[in-house]
Every structure is written in C-alpha cells, then in structure tokens.
C-alpha cells in the first residue's frame, strides 16, 4: 500500500486543508505515516505570512528530501502560491501546487512517476472566483473541529501578503457549510470553529446572504451542536444583525477574537485598516451590552513603521480601558513584497521588543482579571488532552466556551465530552479546576429517571 506523510506550517486554515488533502489520499488507498517516518509521498503545506514562514517552510522541505530521497516531494500552501519558482529551485522538489487545485495533486503524482519531470501546478490565484470545495468529515488529532467557510481577502492591509497567497474573497455555499457542520457533529464533535482567511467577511461576495444569516442557520439547523466558535472577525464585520444573532443563540460561544492590530488611528491609516478606534470602541460597547461576560481576544502588531511612543501608548491605553481578555502580540516584521516593508521610519528592534514585553505583561494581567470573575463558579469545558506540564498524574486541559484554559484532574474518557468543572484558582496561562461531573452522564441519567 502506498504511504503519505504530511507536515503543516502556519494557521488553522492550513491545518484544515491538510486534513482535506489527506481525505483525497485516503480515498485513493494511501496509508498515513508520521512525517519523521519513511513514506512514498511527502506533502508539505507551507506558510508565507512572514519571511520566517518562508524560511521554516524551506527547512521542512529539505528535511523531507533527506528523509527519503526517493520519495515524491509535493509542496502546497501559501509559500508555494507566492514563490513557486523559489521552491522548484530546491533540488529534490517534485511537485508544487498553490492554494487551489489541490484535487489535482494525486494526478500530478502519477504524472511525475511516469515522466520523472518536476511539475509546477501553480495557477494565478487572483483569477479564482469560486470557493474550492474540500470536505473534511473528521480530524486526525483535534477535539474542536474546524469548518472552513470562506477563502481569500479583499483588504490588502499594507503589512500583509495574504491576498497574494489566497486571492480575493470567495464564500462557501451555505448549504455545503451546514451539511459539513452536521457531518462533524454526527462524527462526535461538540464544538465547531468557523474558520477562513477572513472569516467574518463571509457572504460579502453574495447577493442576498451574509455572515449573520449563516450563523443563524448553523444555530437552528445543525442538530446536536453544542458550541459554535468564530475563529476571527473584524470590527467592521460585527454588524447589528450579527450582534442580534449572538444575543439570541445559546450555542455561539461567549468569546470573539477581534484583531485590533493597533489602537492608534494614525497607525491604522498607515496599515490601511478599515476602521477607526471610535468605531471599534462603539462595537465593543454594543457587544458587551448584549453579551455580558463576553471574552474578547485580539491580535496586536507592535512597532509598525513610524510608530511613536505616543501611538504605542494609545494602543496600550485602549486595550487596558476596554479590558481585552487576552492578546496575541507580534513585533512588526518586514514582509517582502508588501508596501509596509518599503516604508521609511522602520522601528528599532530593541524598541519593538521592549513594547512587546509591556503589552504581554498587560495581556497577562488582563487575562487574570477576566478569569478571576469566575473563581468558585462551575463552568463547562471540553477536555482536549492530557496536561503534561505537571508532575501530578491524570491531569487534563480544555477550554470553557469563553476561552479560559482550565486544568483539572480527570480521566482519559472525558476527552471530547462536555464536563462541568469548578474553577478553584484563576490564573494565566491556565486556571485550576475541580471536576464536578460529565454533562452527557447527567443527560442520560435524567432520561433514565424520566422514562
């Protein structure tokens, strides 16, 4: 039997697509191997969001070639899309496919085996107008199922290469989204994470449909789903209609990831972001009024070209005032090919790092403050895996619906179920909890008693 091994770099979308590509290989009769093992085919799903992403991708490609010099080396993903010639120039690379036409991969492998000539299967992503259907009925290693709902982005922020790697925004057919959500729930997943390159932009390319309608339909039509999480949504996409759906639903979780990138209007303008801080504040206030206890996490880029200490403090103070529950903080790094990389006034690395540390310290403090509201409360978590960072045995880790990481003493069979846990000690990066009961057992018991 032919064997295949995968390595995925980068974001949730890439992980989702690797699972989809694995389905294609599985249907063709392949067996999956670990990337460290010898396989007939190696598929490397690459990332290009930073120059480091490119570098890491090249390292992994070379590792696969060393692993089995006779294997077929197939490179796909964002770096493959933006720099196919660069990848084809690596001796030992056999096939390059970008961020579309993934279903052609198996055909290319057969063709390569016959002709022994490297194949560049990358086409112009900017011409793609239709969402490429790739199904994932189950995941290899995760308790939360990702569900990709759209592709591409029309924003062209000055720091970002992604539209060139993923093309313009294309939304997935809503019926396909609902069908796959049902499939995932039927396969046993309790939580579905809606994901995409620009997730909240879903429906912007459709006439009479939008993201709020999709959320509403997922909420009412998918039987048995316990949690629906939005991986990321822009402030400009949080319409009053979206807020109404969130308010109505008891399945859409009390957590939103809203990338802010900067809290300074002048920096946002240089970044070519589509909102002002006044607008962002208005959306946050509206959300928190409709959804008490809402956890808001965010991404921040520190040290964007020209960022002054005053502009940085605008960001710092905005985040402090609006009590975000956690931040992902990134020092700005030049991405070759973007307008920001050519801007003057690049910020000194030491200044960047010092600002990053200040924001991370604020994030840790805010995360603890947010979690402390829930001390001694009983919350529902979905255990994901054994917790390895402790000497104590039988410790497991999972997330509440409002994205608090909780560690508690439990058993292996609780993984993937909904479990009630009392928060004993709030903290960061995780909270300490005490097992109360498994929710499914409670439901079964209730049904037994009432029958």
From Swiss-Prot:
Instruction: Provide the protein's localization.
Output: Cytoplasm
- What Pfam families is this protein classified in? Radical_SAM (PF04055), TRAM (PF01938), UPF0004 (PF00919)
Q: Which GO terms describe its molecular function?
A: 4 iron, 4 sulfur cluster binding; metal ion binding; N6-threonylcarbomyladenosine methylthiotransferase activity; tRNA (N(6)-L-threonylcarbamoyladenosine(37)-C(2))-methylthiotransferase
* Major enzyme class: transferase
Where on this chain does [4Fe-4S] cluster 1 bind? 11, 47, 78
Details of cofactor binding: Binds 2 [4Fe-4S] clusters. One cluster is coordinated with 3 cysteines and an exchangeable S-adenosyl-L-methionine.
Q: Where is the MTTase N-terminal domain?
A: 2-114
What processes in GO biological process is this protein linked to?
tRNA methylthiolation
Query: Where in this chain does the record put each TRAM domain?
Result: 372-437
Q: Which UniProt keywords apply?
A: 4Fe-4S, Cytoplasm, Iron, Iron-sulfur, Metal-binding, S-adenosyl-L-methionine, Transferase, tRNA processing
Q: What InterPro entries does this protein's entry cite?
A: Elp3/MiaA/NifB-like_rSAM (IPR006638), Methylthiotransferase (IPR005839), Methylthiotransferase_CS (IPR020612), Methylthiotransferase_N (IPR013848), Methylthiotransferase_N_sf (IPR038135), MiaB-like_bact (IPR006467), rSAM (IPR007197), rSAM_horseshoe (IPR023404)
**Domain Radical SAM core, residue spans:** 139-369
Q: Cite the SUPFAM superfamilies for this sequence.
A: Radical SAM enzymes (SSF102114)
Q: Write down the SMART domains for this protein, in alphabetical order.
A: Elp3
Q: Which reaction equation describes what this protein catalyses?
A: N(6)-L-threonylcarbamoyladenosine(37) in tRNA + (sulfur carrier)-SH + AH2 + 2 S-adenosyl-L-methionine = 2-methylsulfanyl-N(6)-L-threonylcarbamoyladenosine(37) in tRNA + (sulfur carrier)-H + 5'-deoxyadenosine + L-methionine + A + S-adenosyl-L-homocysteine + 2 H(+)
Q: Tell me which NCBIfam families the record gives.
A: MiaB-like-C, MiaB/RimO family radical SAM methylthiotransferase
Which PANTHER family would you find in this protein's record?
RADICAL SAM PROTEINS, THREONYLCARBAMOYLADENOSINE TRNA METHYLTHIOTRANSFERASE
Q: What is this protein called?
A: Threonylcarbamoyladenosine tRNA methylthiotransferase MtaB
What species was this sequence derived from?
Bacillus subtilis (strain 168)
């Amino acid at each position: 039997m032919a064997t295949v091994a995968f390595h995925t770099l980068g974001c949730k979308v890439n992980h989702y697509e690797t699972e989809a590509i694995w389905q294609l290989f599985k249907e063709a009769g392949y067996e999956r191997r670990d990337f460290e093992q010898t396989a007939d085919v190696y598929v490397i799903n690459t990332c290009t969001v930073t120059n480091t992403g490119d570098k890491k991708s090249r390292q992994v490609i070379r590792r696969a070639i060393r692993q089995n010099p006779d294997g077929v080396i197939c490179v796909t993903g964002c770096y493959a899309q933006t720099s196919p010639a660069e990848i084809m120039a690596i001796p030992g690379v056999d096939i390059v496919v970008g961020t579309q036409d993934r279903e052609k991969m198996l055909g290319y492998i057969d063709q390569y085996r016959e002709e022994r000539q490297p194949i560049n299967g990358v086409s112009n992503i900017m011409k793609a107008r239709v969402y490429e259907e790739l199904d994932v009925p189950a995941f290899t290693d995760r308790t939360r199922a990702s569900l990709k709902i759209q592709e591409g982005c029309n924003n062209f922020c000055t720091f970002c290469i992604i539209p060139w790697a993923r093309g313009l925004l294309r939304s997935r057919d809503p019926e396909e989204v609902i069908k796959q959500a049902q499939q995932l729930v039927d396969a046993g997943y309790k939580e579905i994470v809606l994901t995409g390159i620009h997730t909240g932009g879903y429906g912007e390319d459709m006439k009479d449909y939008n993201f709020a309608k999709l959320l509403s339909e997922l909420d009412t039509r998918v039987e048995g789903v316990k949690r629906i999480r939005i991986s990321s949504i822009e402030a400009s996409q949080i319409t009053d209609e979206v807020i109404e759906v969130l308010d109505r639903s008891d399945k859409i979780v009390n957590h939103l990831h809203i990338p802010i990138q900067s809290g300074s209007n002048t920096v946002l303008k240089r970044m070519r972001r589509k909102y002002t801080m006044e607008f962002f504040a208005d959306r946050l206030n509206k959300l928190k009024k409709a959804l008490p206890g809402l956890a808001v996490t965010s991404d921040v880029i520190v040290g964007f070209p020209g960022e002054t200490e005053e502009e940085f403090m605008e960001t710092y103070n905005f985040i402090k005032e609006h009590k975000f529950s956690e931040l992902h903080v990134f020092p700005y790094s030049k991405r070759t090919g973007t307008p920001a990389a050519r801007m003057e006034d690049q910020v000194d690395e030491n200044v960047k790092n010092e600002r990053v540390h200040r924001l991370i310290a604020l994030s840790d403090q805010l995360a603890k403050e947010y979690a402390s509201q829930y001390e001694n409360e009983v919350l529902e978590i979905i255990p994901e895996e054994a917790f390895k960072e402790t000497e104590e045995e039988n410790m497991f880790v999972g997330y509440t619906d409002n994205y608090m990481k909780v560690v508690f003493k439990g058993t292996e069979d609780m993984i993937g179920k909904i479990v009630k846990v009392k928060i004993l000690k709030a903290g960061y990066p995780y909270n300490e909890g005490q097992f109360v009961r498994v929710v499914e057992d409670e439901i079964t018991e209730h049904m037994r008693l009432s029958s």
